[in-house]
Amino acid sequence: MTRSDTAMSDAATHELVLTRVFDAPRELVFQCWTDPEHLAQWWGPAGMTPTGVDVDTTDGGAWRIGMSDGEAEYWASGVYLELAPPERLVFSFKWDPREGQPDEDTLVTITFADRDGKTEMTFHQTGFATVESRDGHTDGWRSTFDELAAHLDSGEETS
């Protein structure tokens, strides 16, 4: 895997933009975001293990994904607002209430572009309550995308 990612953020608007190139076709990268069997293999940053995946991949369908660090579980959920395979995915994102976890609803927009057989994925998340929350998510998503890249590189197929 070639790690090629860039990050931009805007303190005034509390937005996060990450761009990463994956050595995989965009159809597969998109599927990794919407297929529960794929999600169960890569979702979460290093040191976390997916513990549950429930997705209804229709416009307006709900999703909920859990992960654990071995001591505690963390759950996030939202609603799919737009699914345009393999080009664009839009969903709401919110952490379940937990002490120390920000209570904020964010919006995630992901675009997938073909780049000579590879996929350029642009991840855009808006609606952070604080710059600190945005910055924490930046580190988490970067590590999560490393997990996605490792999953893609493994060549593991789902049933």
Residue spans for each PLM region:
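A conserved amphipathic terminal alpha-helix motif
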Residues: 2, 127-159
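Hydrophobic pocket/interface hotspot
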Residues: 29, 39, 63, 80, ...
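Short beta-edge strand/loop motif at the mouth of beta-sheet-based domains
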Residues: 17-18, 37-73
